[in-house]
């Protein structure tokens, strides 16, 4: 079997295709979560905390060159080391939301699988088998 045909067999298996579809959907879903975090949740948190833009929350770890604007992008371009905790907070919130949603999906899937795997009611024993068991039991019983 040539390498190309082996690869074709591998690529056409259901698991690989399912994985590819999952990765594509996951990437698209990640963008939705990014939007929810950046456009809906972080502005509300920023409003409560008093800062509207978390991405510009940082601490300079060195003095900037004279005339450098005090924005994160300008300081990074000037080579000033900064501790950008605002961006980190946004990413942490993003991760927590994504992890929670995935947990809820897996939980629902597992419950659905458990429901499908519930044992069926035992089948009714056919009459001929019941009769044979009765005959067997009567033959085993002590005679008086």
Curated annotation (Swiss-Prot):
Keywords: Cell inner membrane, Cell membrane, Ion channel, Ion transport, Membrane, Transmembrane, Transmembrane helix, Transport. The chain crosses the membrane at residues 16-36, 86-106. The keyword Transcription regulation does not apply. SUPFAM superfamilies: Gated mechanosensitive channel. One of its GO terms (cellular component) is plasma membrane. It is found in: Cell inner membrane. It is a multi-pass membrane protein. It comes from the Bacteria. One of its GO terms (molecular function) is mechanosensitive monoatomic ion channel activity. PANTHER family: LARGE-CONDUCTANCE MECHANOSENSITIVE CHANNEL (PTHR30266:SF2), MECHANOSENSITIVE CHANNEL MSCL (PTHR30266). Homopentamer. Belongs to the MscL family. Channel that opens in response to stretch forces in the membrane lipid bilayer. May participate in the regulation of osmotic pressure changes within the cell. This is Large-conductance mechanosensitive channel.
């Amino acid at each position: 079997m040539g390498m190309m045909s082996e690869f074709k067999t591998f690529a056409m298996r259901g698991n690989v295709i399912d994985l590819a579809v999952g990765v594509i959907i996951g990437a698209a879903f990640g963008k939705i979560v990014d939007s929810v975090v950046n456009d809906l949740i972080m502005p509300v948190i920023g409003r409560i905390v008093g800062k509207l833009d978390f991405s510009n929350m940082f601490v300079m770890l060195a003095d900037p060159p004279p005339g450098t604007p005090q924005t994160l992008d300008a300081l990074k371009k000037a080579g000033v080391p900064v501790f950008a905790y605002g961006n980190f907070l946004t990413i942490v919130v993003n991760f927590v939301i994504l992890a929670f949603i995935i947990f809820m999906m897996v939980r629902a899937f597992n419950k659905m699988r458990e429901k499908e795997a519930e044992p069926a009611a035992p089948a009714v024993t056919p009459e001929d088998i019941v009769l044979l068991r009765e005959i067997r039991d009567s033959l085993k019983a002590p005679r008086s």
